[in-house]
Regions:
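N-terminal leader/linker segments that initiate helical-solenoid repeat arrays
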Residues: 16-90, 101, 106, 110, ...
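Start-of-helix register in tetratricopeptide repeats
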Residues: 49, 56, 90, 124, ...
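Register position in tetratricopeptide repeats
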Residues: 60, 67, 101, 135-136, ...
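Canonical tetratricopeptide repeat
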Residues: 53, 94, 128, 162, ...
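Short coil turns that delineate tetratricopeptide repeat
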Residues: 45, 86, 120, 154, ...
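Residue-level recognition of tetratricopeptide repeat
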Residues: 56, 63, 97, 131, ...
Length: 419
């Protein structure tokens, strides 16, 4: 497979401003993107559609690799497209995808709404609306947009995957799995990247439901298609941790971190090192995470939710945890931000508000072992042992990574609550 650099150099000369689309020398387009880009760039590179195709390929590659540098390259390609044909609709859609990838969700939502008013029956604009609303916690609006996708083009693949993500958030893991399975059946056997992504999401759903064996099979299928597929490695590590195979979990998370050296991945590796008894290495990894995460904390694309838990649980800085959680809460209200905010409130002794926020998150319907454990510990702190028992039992029943701590907390509840 040709390196992306060799493809991009073909268009560099056509940039009026002399801008370059150079990528890391080791970067590669997946086969589908290589086909699009090479076909386009060997025809007439002056045509705006070809720069759109290149930008779309780069966005997809950014999603596959979690390498944000591809978004800047995609933006450069879009600028050329828009110079050739100002305000062309496809370029504007791709620009929203870039905003989503850069985690500027409010700007993405605003831009997608503008495009929706311009062309009210474009399926993928509804997909962009779904994505932005999900990330911001506007779940009703996300559901409405996903339904429009299905109404306009029944059974289309992007709609199925988005509907599946919503079903999971609403607590219907089985329904989510069925939709992902339909999406997999609709995906070409030649599209290894898309199939690996879908298999990983299906494995995640089985793991979230406590079916570790089924999850393992699906995740292994994903890595057979794309060796060392980062998302699959992360979920395989969760299975190893749940099975107390901590050394194996460390090895998997080291592979993932080498492939995608992002701060949030370092945090997961540090936790696994701690569980494996490699305390000095864990301490260094946590400290490195803290420095890196703090440095990016004011950017939209950050690891602030992990940093909240680092401050709250690892270095006992509850005030910093709460300040950071409030910063995130100001602009997004998805269930995971609410969870981090609730936990920071709990660590600062603000139990009533903590309970309000965690119950707001759970009211969406999500069944997540960590959120349920947090809800249980908050309820226990307030003295509502019956609610605490209910939440903790649900966390334990999911048999996930956080279930062991829930089991320990449950065992420590007053006996009257368990009768």
């Amino acid at each position: 497979m040709k390196k992306i650099l060799s493809l991009l150099c073909m268009v560099a000369a056509s940039f009026a401003e002399g801008q370059s689309l150079a990528a890391p020398a080791s970067a590669r387009l997946s086969p589908a993107e290589q086909n699009i880009a090479s076909k386009s760039l060997t025809n007439t590179p002056q045509q705006y559609q070809e720069f759109n195709a290149l930008a779309a390929a780069l966005v997809r590659r950014a999603l596959e690799t979690s390498d944000a540098s591809y978004y800047a390259q995609a933006e450069t390609a879009l600028k050329r497209s828009l110079q050739l044909v100002p305000d062309n609709f496809e370029a504007e859609k791709i620009r929203v995808s870039i905003l989503l990838g850069e985690h500027d969700f409010p700007a993405a939502l605003d831009a997608a709404q503008t495009l929706n008013r311009r062309v009210p029956d474009d399926v993928m604009v509804y997909g962009l609306l779904t994505d932005a609303n999900m990330e911001l916690g506007n779940y009703k609006d996300a559901e409405t947009a996903a339904q429009w996708m299905l109404n306009l083009r029944p059974g289309n693949l992007p709609a199925l995957t988005r509907a599946a993500k919503l079903r999971e958030l609403f607590g219907d893991a089985e329904g989510a799995y069925e939709l992902m399975e339909l999406a997999l059946q609709s995906t070409s056997p030649a599209d290894a990247e898309e199939r690996a992504s879908l298999l990983t999401q299906m494995g995640h759903l089985r793991l979230a439901s406590g079916s570790a064996d089924a999850a393992e099979k699906l995740l292994q299928q994903a890595t057979s298609l794309i060796p060392n597929y980062p998302a699959a490695l992360g979920d395989l590590a969760k299975i190893r941790i749940a099975g107390k195979q901590f050394a194996d979990a460390v090895a998997l998370l080291e592979q993932r971190y080498q492939a995608v050296p992002r701060a949030e991945n370092l945090y997961d590796l540090a936790e696994a090192l701690q569980l494996a008894g490699r305390h000095d290495e864990a301490k260094r990894a946590f400290a490195d995470f803290g420095r890196r995460s703090l440095a990016e904390s004011n950017a939209k694309d950050n690891s602030n939710r992990k940093l909240v838990f680092y401050y709250a649980d690892k270095v006992q800085m509850p005030v910093k945890a709460l300040d950071l959680a409030k910063q995130e809460f100001q602009w997004r209200h998805d269930v995971f931000t609410l969870d981090a905010y609730a936990w920071a409130l709990h660590e600062n002794g603000q139990e009533a508000e903590a309970r309000k926020q965690i119950e707001t998150a759970l009211a969406v319907g999500i069944r997540d072992a960590s959120l349920l454990r947090h809800a249980g510990e908050i309820a226990a702190k307030i003295g509502d042992t019956f609610a605490a028992e209910s939440y903790l039992k649900q966390s334990v029943d999911l048999n996930a990574m956080d279930s062991e701590r829930a089991r320990i907390t449950l065992a420590g509840l007053p006996q009257a609550a368990k009768q």
